Structure formats: structure tokens, C-alpha cells
């Protein structure tokens, strides 16, 4: 096993622990808590894949971080922060909409790269909107936290989420997964719209119905 893979996991575990302590003191906002919950699932998946104990990894990560901080000067820290591009967090969904449980009468599930797609094929002839919470950098979608499909009545009928065991995806991966979800929902006569945030940062183009512009062979 590559040593960088192990040490990266150890540092991630310790930093998650620090963020959890921060949240436990009531100091985290909604986007912070969203990421905390998602990252916990990701760490569990990575730990299982690597065969590493999270508690042991957290202690090792603490030692690594302490060593780095001991060597770090304030001036170096300022230069590092200044050179890192900042990302923005965009939220179509409330925390309640993100954490709400839902079930499918006729489930269809598919894995597309590192993204997990689920939809209820029992839903027919409904108006559906896709909402997503994600981060943006350089005016492009950086990381998808969660995407869900809602009916006008507020019922959840579809979802796209990152697989904890396969971290990392591009805006193109998200676009492809959304097209799969849209195609599955429209198969039963549903009308699907995409939120303005997704239109702007994932596709940069749309048609008059608020839908992503699909390649010619898919129209």
C-alpha cells in the first residue's frame, strides 16, 4: 500500500475529528454540517477499502499535523493561503431536504463512475425539479455534495450522490449522471427541470424549458 495513501487518510481522519469538535460546540453552519456528514461516510468507505482503523488513523494524523504546525511559520502560512483559489458553496436544498429519508416503490439504481444514481420508476406524469448542493471553483462545479429530484408536492423521487469508497468526480461526471437521471424520469412521461445553479455551473447552457442542452444524438 502506498505510504502517501495511508498518511493522507490519517490526516483526513484527524481533520474530520477537529471539524466534528467544532460542530459539537454549535459553531458550524449548514454547509459545514453538510460536508461533515458526507465526509464521515467517505472516511468510513476509505477505511474499509484500505483496511485501516479510523481511531488509530486519527491518532497518527494528529502526530503528522502537529509536526507540520511545529515547522510552519506565520509568513509561510500567509503565502500558502494566498496562493490557494477559494471555492464557494451553493445550496438549492435545505438541511432538512438533504437529510430526509425516502423510499422507492419501483427502484432503479446505477453507478456512473464515482456517482451513485437512484430513482423511483413508479413516478409518472409529474413535474420534477432537480436540486443540488455543491461547491464551485473558477465558475465551474467542483464537488457535488448531493443532488435530489423533487415533485411539485415535495416528494423525493431521485438522487445522485458520491460513492464514499470512490472519492473524486468532475463536472462532466455530474453532467453525465444527471442526463441518466433525467432520461430515466422522462421515460414515464415526467417533465424534468434543472435548478438555475446547476444550469449555470454544470452546463453553462440551457433550452427554454430550463433543461440542459443535450448532445444531438440524445435530443
From Swiss-Prot:
Region described as RNA-binding and homodimerization: 1-73
Keywords: Eukaryotic host gene expression shutoff by virus, Host cytoplasm, Host gene expression shutoff by virus, Host mRNA suppression by virus, Host nucleus, Host-virus interaction, Inhibition of host innate immune response by virus, Inhibition of host interferon signaling pathway by virus, Inhibition of host PKR by virus, Inhibition of host pre-mRNA processing by virus, Inhibition of host RIG-I by virus, Inhibition of host RLR pathway by virus, Interferon antiviral system evasion, RNA-binding, Ubl conjugation, Viral immunoevasion
The keyword Cytoplasm belongs to this UniProt entry's keyword annotation: no
Alphabetized GO MF terms: protein serine/threonine kinase inhibitor activity; RNA binding
Keyword RNA-binding belongs to the record: yes
Subcellular location: Host nucleus; Host cytoplasm
Domain of life: Viruses
Region of interest called CPSF4-binding, as start-end residue ranges on this chain: 180-215
Subunit comment: Homodimer. Interacts with host TRIM25 (via coiled coil); this interaction specifically inhibits TRIM25 multimerization and TRIM25-mediated RIGI CARD ubiquitination. Interacts with human EIF2AK2/PKR, CPSF4, IVNS1ABP and PABPN1.
This protein's name: Non-structural protein 1
Lineage: Viruses, Riboviria, Orthornavirae, Negarnaviricota, Polyploviricotina
Amino acid at each position: 500500500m502506498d505510504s502517501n495513501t495511508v498518511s493522507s487518510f490519517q490526516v483526513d481522519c484527524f481533520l474530520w475529528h477537529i471539524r466534528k469538535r467544532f460542530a459539537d460546540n454549535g459553531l458550524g453552519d449548514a454547509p459545514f454540517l453538510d460536508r461533515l456528514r458526507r465526509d464521515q461516510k467517505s472516511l468510513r468507505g476509505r477505511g474499509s477499502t484500505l483496511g485501516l482503523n479510523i481511531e488509530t488513523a486519527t491518532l497518527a494524523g494528529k502526530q503528522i499535523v502537529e509536526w507540520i504546525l511545529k515547522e510552519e511559520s506565520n509568513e509561510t502560512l500567509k503565502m500558502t493561503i494566498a496562493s490557494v483559489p477559494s471555492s464557494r458553496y451553493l445550496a438549492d436544498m435545505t438541511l432538512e431536504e438533504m437529510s430526509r429519508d425516502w423510499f422507492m416503490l419501483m427502484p432503479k439504481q446505477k453507478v456512473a463512475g464515482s456517482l451513485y444514481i437512484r430513482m423511483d420508476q413508479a413516478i409518472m406524469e409529474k413535474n420534477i425539479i432537480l436540486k443540488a448542493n455543491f461547491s464551485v471553483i473558477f465558475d465551474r462545479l467542483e464537488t457535488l455534495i448531493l443532488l435530489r429530484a423533487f415533485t411539485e408536492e415535495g416528494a423525493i423521487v431521485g438522487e445522485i450522490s458520491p460513492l464514499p469508497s470512490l472519492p473524486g468526480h468532475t463536472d462532466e461526471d455530474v453532467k453525465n449522471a444527471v442526463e441518466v437521471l433525467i432520461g430515466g424520469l422522462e421515460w414515464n412521461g415526467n417533465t424534468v427541470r434543472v435548478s438555475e445553479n446547476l444550469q449555470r455551473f454544470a452546463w453553462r447552457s440551457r433550452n427554454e424549458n430550463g433543461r440542459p442542452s443535450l448532445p444531438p444524438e440524445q435530443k
